[in-house]
Structures are given as structure tokens and as C-alpha cells.
């Protein structure tokens, strides 16, 4: 059996068409959605991500601002800029690209963003709302994964789901969204004793560790859905995920490729969150 590919690019295209239509409707009423992107330093991967986010805004009718600062920017100056963006009525979403330089406290920066503009869903108020099942924003990558599972009609109610990774950005919110959908969820991580014992019983596996080949064919239940959130490079410098794709695709029922799987969905859900923020603001001021 060869797994069916979950095509993040195709699904992303469909969702972005909806985003563009909603953006056009808001703009026609004088409420163009706006996303502010802030980059501190010159991390090459961050530069690529930011460029893709700004381009996605332009391509789909959202306004965007891009602030780029040197790596030695004082924390106080970054916080002052966030305060300005919080008060700017043209901006509905604020994204500070992580990681930040070591002298800047990323928790302090995230908490400085107004919760209603925190389109990444990282603010403690939004994390708490997600925990209680009433999220204002769902974090973009887990939100994208849920959209993929829904689009391919992969059943979650009563399913055994394993999330490998416990980060605040992917692992923890991913587990909460799967739980909300009715799955029985296990979170595994670097201290998990026997990872394969958990994954072999899983109907759905989400790998989000940043470690190549953490999931191999012998660790996967036949027919399972395998979602690869990882972004790594192999020996030849080629982009790859956390999953041994060549092996696992012969066992799994569904699998996401890297690239072309989860990656495009992350930026798409950022656009969706920004649109939702703009729609809320427009409704409040109607």
C-alpha cells in the first residue's frame, strides 16, 4: 500500500481564494485587512519566512507593513514599536518573527501584542482561551493541520492520536485541537521512553520535533495518517521533514510531503486569522 498524499499546496490555494474574496469584501467597505510583520536580526530562515508572509498578503489583497531591525535592537525599542502597532487602526494582525536575539525576552514581546491582534495565537490570553475551548485565534500550524485532516475526511472522533513534540508553537496547541475534535491524544517528546510503543497504536501521528527520521516505517500502524511538521535539511542540503518519507509512505494511509505539505498551510492560516481579526473589528465598528 502506498499512502495517499495530503496536498497542502492545493488545499492552501483553495483557502487563499476564500481569503482573497473576504479581503476584497472588507476593502470595499473601507476595512482593508492589515498584517504587520516585524523581523529583528538577519536569520536566513526567518528572512525567507517573512518574505513569503509579506508576499502572501500582497497576493491575496491584504495590506502589510514590514519592519526590519538590526540584531542589536534594544528590547525597549521593539516593545515601543509593538505598542504603536497595537494602536494603529490599519493593522489587524501583528507577527513578530521568532526566534529573537538572545538579549530580547520573547515572552515579554509576545505578551506586549494586543490579544485581538495576536494572529499567531501565542499570547497567554489566547493560549488560555484555546485551553478552555473558546479560542480567539488558533495557532497557525496546528490550525493548518486540522484543516488538512478535515479536507481529507480523516476521522478524529475516538481515534488514537500521537503528537511528537511539546512546543508552545506546535505540539501543545496541536494536542488541544485534536482533543477538541474528539481524539484520544498522547504527547510524546525527547524524554519519552519508547516512542514506537505509542506511535504503533496511533491512527494519526503528528511529528513536530525538528529531528530527521524520528518516525520510521516500523513505527507506524498500517493505514495511519502521518502529518510531518518538521523542516530540516538532509546531507545534500535538500529540504526534508521529521518523517522517513520513503519508508513511511509504504505503510501509512495518508502522509504529508515536505515540502508541499504543512508549510504552505501555516502561512495560509496566518492570512485566515488576520481576515478574522479584521472582520471582528469591522463588525464591532459597524
From Swiss-Prot:
GO terms for biological process: L-histidine biosynthetic process; methionine biosynthetic process; purine nucleotide biosynthetic process; tetrahydrofolate interconversion. It catalyses: (6R)-5,10-methylene-5,6,7,8-tetrahydrofolate + NADP(+) = (6R)-5,10-methenyltetrahydrofolate + NADPH; (6R)-5,10-methenyltetrahydrofolate + H2O = (6R)-10-formyltetrahydrofolate + H(+). CDD domains: NAD_bind_m-THF_DH_Cyclohyd. HAMAP family: THF_DHG_CYH. Its EC number is 1.5.1.5, 3.5.4.9. This is Bifunctional protein FolD. Homodimer. GO terms for molecular function: methenyltetrahydrofolate cyclohydrolase activity; methylenetetrahydrofolate dehydrogenase (NADP+) activity. PROSITE patterns: THF_DHG_CYH_1, THF_DHG_CYH_2. Pathway: One-carbon metabolism; tetrahydrofolate interconversion. Belongs to the tetrahydrofolate dehydrogenase/cyclohydrolase family. Keywords: Amino-acid biosynthesis, Histidine biosynthesis, Hydrolase, Methionine biosynthesis, Multifunctional enzyme, NADP, One-carbon metabolism, Oxidoreductase, Purine biosynthesis. NADP(+) binds at residues 165-167, 190.
Amino acid at each position: 500500500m502506498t499512502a495517499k498524499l495530503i496536498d497542502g499546496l492545493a488545499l492552501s490555494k483553495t483557502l487563499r481564494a476564500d481569503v482573497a474574496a473576504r479581503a476584497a469584501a472588507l476593502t470595499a467597505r473601507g476595512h482593508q485587512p492589515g498584517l504587520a510583520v516585524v523581523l529583528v536580526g538577519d536569520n536566513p530562515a526567518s528572512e525567507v519566512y517573512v518574505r513569503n508572509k509579506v508576499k502572501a498578503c500582497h497576493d491575496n489583497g491584504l495590506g502589510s507593513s514590514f519592519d526590519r531591525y538590526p540584531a542589536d535592537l534594544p528590547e525597549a525599542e521593539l516593545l515601543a514599536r509593538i505598542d504603536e502597532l497595537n494602536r494603529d487602526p490599519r493593522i489587524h494582525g501583528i507577527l513578530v518573527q521568532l526566534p529573537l536575539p538572545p538579549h530580547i525576552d520573547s515572552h515579554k514581546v509576545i505578551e506586549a501584542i494586543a490579544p485581538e491582534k495576536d494572529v499567531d495565537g501565542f499570547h497567554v490570553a489566547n493560549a488560555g482561551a484555546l485551553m478552555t475551548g473558546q479560542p480567539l485565534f488558533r495557532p497557525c500550524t496546528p490550525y493548518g493541520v486540522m484543516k488538512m485532516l478535515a479536507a481529507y475526511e480523516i476521522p478524529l472522533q475516538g481515534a488514537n492520536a500521537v503528537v511528537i513534540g511539546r512546543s508552545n508553537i506546535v505540539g501543545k496547541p496541536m494536542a488541544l485541537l485534536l482533543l477538541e475534535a474528539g481524539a484520544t491524544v498522547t504527547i510524546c517528546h525527547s524524554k519519552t521512553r519508547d516512542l514506537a510503543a505509542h506511535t504503533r497504536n496511533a491512527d494519526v501521528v503528528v511529528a513536530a520535533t525538528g529531528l530527521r527520521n524520528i518516525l520510521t516505517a516500523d513505527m507506524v500502524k498500517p493505514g495511519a495518517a502521518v502529518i510531518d511538521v518538521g523542516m530540516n535539511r538532509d546531507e545534500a542540503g535538500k529540504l526534508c521533514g521529521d518523517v522517513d518519507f520513503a519508508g513511511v509512505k509504504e505503510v501509512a494511509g495518508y502522509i504529508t510531503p515536505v515540502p508541499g505539505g504543512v508549510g504552505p498551510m501555516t502561512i495560509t492560516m496566518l492570512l485566515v486569522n488576520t481576515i478574522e481579526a479584521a472582520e471582528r473589528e469591522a463588525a464591532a465598528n459597524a
